[in-house]
């Protein structure tokens, strides 16, 4: 068994690559001063807020908060585990990882031997089923069916479509011959166990569509029955390696085209993706016939534009609405392509051809236009009550638009269609927005978004951030802060980051923000990269350092002062003036101490 990659080897890889070169393969970067800037690949934006520091070998997006080092970037952009990212960067750095081959080849540090066996078994059966389909008489009927519906040999090979034979024990015999545990294969969803103890294949006499996770591992199948009968489709169950709601079909292959176009085409089924790809649309992915889950939506969040092209029937239109609501709530720009006659993308391509479908997908409507059309369905707009209800619902959707120009465009449409005053619609919209817009406290533990102007942060929070920035760049400052403050930072994330900084220097390292960030857990890396990019002087004066420390240590005292103020007010309300006077005296003493500290 291989060993984990030692810290010194990881450090050699980190020093052997330039993060600007690594990120430059994915993002167009332009130098501005000491750093490079570009459009963030993790969220859609028009103005570059993605910063790369060649000096510190880190990146940070001031728009969405993503941040880290070269390892983090590759893991996030490609959806790969740390060891795979290390392997790729080691090749660039000229660092030999052959001694650690087993660990590097393992796709996930935390993956169990059982889970690895499951993915290997899926890969074996995928090759077996594909071979049967394209190279044997047994699979000829299935191959004829696929080609009759318009899929070429190249498309069948590209999607590794296969055929599972009708023989009950074919899969079990193959897996057993390769030393796979049959009980584990049952747990993997590839076999079922009969009452007599025999194991038989879950998929029989079916056209097989392999399902890959976002790293390209085969983790499941969907099998379509060849001929008549029920059930028409049999799908892999939920297993340790397959969670349907966490995977978008074909995303592993479409990731690069999606990133290049900054657009994804979201469809419902396997056949829709395959037909779209054959038509030249290689940025299509599918929810595999289920409603879009929150996990799937978050996968698409970095994409600039998501075009939804679901089935044109009522169920498809309602599913498109639900998916659009979920994606737009995450800040995605959503458009909707509606196909005529209730057709789905696969049917449309078979009837009208791929070129015409590409045109339909290109003529997608903005989300608000789709929603306004959806809201009209089933309403008699000649009826005053239903007409007013439609206008009210449409105004709610228009009010969600951030662009005043877009708002005005749709308001004018409403005004013209229903002979309404534009000023009246503007007034109604403003009134609705005022009613909906109320101050909302962030949930517990939620930190301020990075785009928040730093000057709006409380003084103690700014002080903590600046202290952490100086600590990352100076061992001496870190030692002073450790002695004076220790773990008494007021914000939990700041306390955690400070603890890692203390440990970093205690291990004997010199100041190196990039090396430090590589040792920090992923959830803290965006904060660390953000803090390390703060514009601060190379040296901090004793007075400045003292001021920061004072702000941090005085924060609990100011909070206590507020508590005393509430206690005094409560005593006065009870007409307990003696207690109120005593508390007032305590408050005066506390304020004196705070002003002198």
From Swiss-Prot:
Basic and acidic residues bias locations:
429-447
Q: Where are the zinc fingers (CHC2-type)?
A: 40-64
Cofactor, how bound (note): Binds 1 zinc ion per monomer. Binds two Mg(2+) per subunit.
> Which domain of life, per UniProt?
Bacteria
Annotated GO MF terms: ATP binding; DNA binding; DNA helicase activity; DNA-directed RNA polymerase activity; zinc ion binding
Could you tell me which residues belong to the region Disordered?
Answer: 429-448
Required co-factor(s) are: Zn(2+); Mg(2+)
Identify its protein family: Belongs to the DnaG primase family.
Q: What NCBIfam families has UniProt attached to this entry?
A: dnaG
Q: Report quaternary structure and partners.
A: Monomer. Interacts with replicative helicase DnaB, as DnaB(6):DnaG(3). A stable complex DnaI(6):DnaB(6):DnaG(3) fragment can be isolated; DnaI and DnaG do not contact each other (DnaI in this complex is derived from B.subtilis).
Q: What is known of its domains?
A: Contains an N-terminal zinc-binding domain, a central core domain that contains the primase activity, and a C-terminal DnaB-binding domain.
What does the protein in this record do? RNA polymerase that catalyzes the synthesis of short RNA molecules used as primers for DNA polymerase during DNA replication.
Protein name (database record): DNA primase
Organism classification? Bacteria, Bacillati, Bacillota, Bacilli, Bacillales
The UniProt gene name for this protein comes to: dnaG
């Amino acid at each position: 068994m291989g060993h984990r990659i030692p810290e010194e080897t990881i450090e050699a890889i980190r020093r052997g690559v330039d993060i600007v070169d690594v990120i430059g393969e994915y993002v167009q970067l332009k130098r501005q001063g000491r750093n490079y800037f570009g459009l963030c690949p993790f969220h859609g934006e028009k103005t570059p807020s993605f910063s790369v520091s060649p000096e510190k070998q880190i990146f940070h997006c001031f728009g969405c908060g993503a941040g880290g080092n070269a390892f983090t970037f590759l893991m996030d952009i490609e959806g790969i585990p740390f060891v795979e990212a290390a392997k790729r960067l080691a090749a660039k750095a000229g660092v030999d990882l052959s001694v650690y081959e087993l660990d590097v080849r393992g796709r996930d540090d935390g993956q169990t031997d059982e889970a690895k066996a499951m993915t290997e078994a899926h890969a074996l059966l995928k090759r077996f089923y594909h071979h049967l389909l394209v190279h044997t008489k047994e699979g000829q009927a299935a191959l004829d069916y696929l080609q009759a519906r318009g899929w070429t040999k190249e498309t069948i090979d590209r999607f590794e479509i296969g055929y599972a034979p009708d023989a009950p024990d074919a899969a079990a015999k193959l897996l057993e011959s390769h030393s796979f545990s049959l009980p584990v294969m049952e747990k993997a969803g590839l076999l079922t166990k009969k009452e007599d103890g025999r194991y038989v294949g879950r998929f029989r006499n079916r056209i097989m569509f392999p399902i890959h996770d976002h790293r390209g591992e085969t983790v499941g199948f969907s099998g379509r029955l060849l001929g008549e009968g029920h059930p028409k489709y049999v799908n892999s169950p939920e297993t340790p390696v397959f969670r349907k709601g966490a995977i978008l079909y074909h995303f592993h292959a479409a990731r690069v085209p999606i990133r290049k176009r900054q657009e994804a085409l979201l469809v419902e089924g396997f056949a829709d993706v395959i037909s779209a790809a054959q038509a030249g649309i290689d940025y299509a992915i599918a929810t595999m016939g289920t409603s879009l889950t929150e996990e799937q939506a978050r996968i698409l969040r970095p994409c600039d534009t998501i075009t939804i092209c679901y089935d044109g029937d009522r169920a498809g239109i309602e599913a498109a609405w639900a998916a659009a609501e979920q994606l737009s709530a995450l800040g995605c720009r959503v458009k909707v392509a509606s196909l005529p006659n209730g057709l789905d993308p696969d049917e449309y391509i078979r009837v009208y051809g791929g070129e015409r479908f590409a045109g339909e997908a290109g003529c997608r409507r903005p989300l608000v236009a789709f929603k306004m059309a959806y809201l009209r369905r089933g309403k008699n707009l000649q009826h005053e009550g239903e007409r007013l209800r439609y206008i009210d619902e449409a105004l709610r959707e228009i009010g969600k638009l951030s662009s005043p120009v877009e708002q005005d465009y749709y308001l004018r449409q409403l005004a013209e269609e229903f002979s309404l005053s534009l000023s009246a619609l503007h007034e109604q919209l403003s009134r609705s927005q005022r009613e909906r817009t109320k101050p909302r406290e962030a949930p517990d533990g939620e930190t301020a978004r990075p785009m928040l102007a730093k000057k709006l942060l409380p003084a103690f929070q700014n002080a903590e951030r600046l202290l952490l920035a100086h600590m990352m760049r100076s061992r001496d400052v870190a030692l002073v802060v450790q002695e004076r403050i220790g773990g008494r930072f007021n914000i939990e994330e700041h306390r955690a980051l400070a603890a890692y900084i203390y440990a970093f220097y205690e291990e004997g390292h010199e100041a190196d923000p990039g090396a430090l960030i590589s040792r920090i857990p992923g959830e803290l890396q965006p904060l660390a990269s953000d803090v390390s990019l703060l514009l601060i002087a190379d040296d901090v004066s004793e007075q400045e350092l003292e001021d920061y420390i004072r702000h941090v240590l005085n924060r609990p005292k100011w909070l206590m002062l507020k508590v005393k103020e509430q206690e005094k007010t409560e005593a006065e309300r009870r007409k307990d003036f003696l207690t109120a006077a005593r508390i007032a005296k305590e408050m005066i003493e506390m304020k004196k101490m705070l002003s002198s500290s």
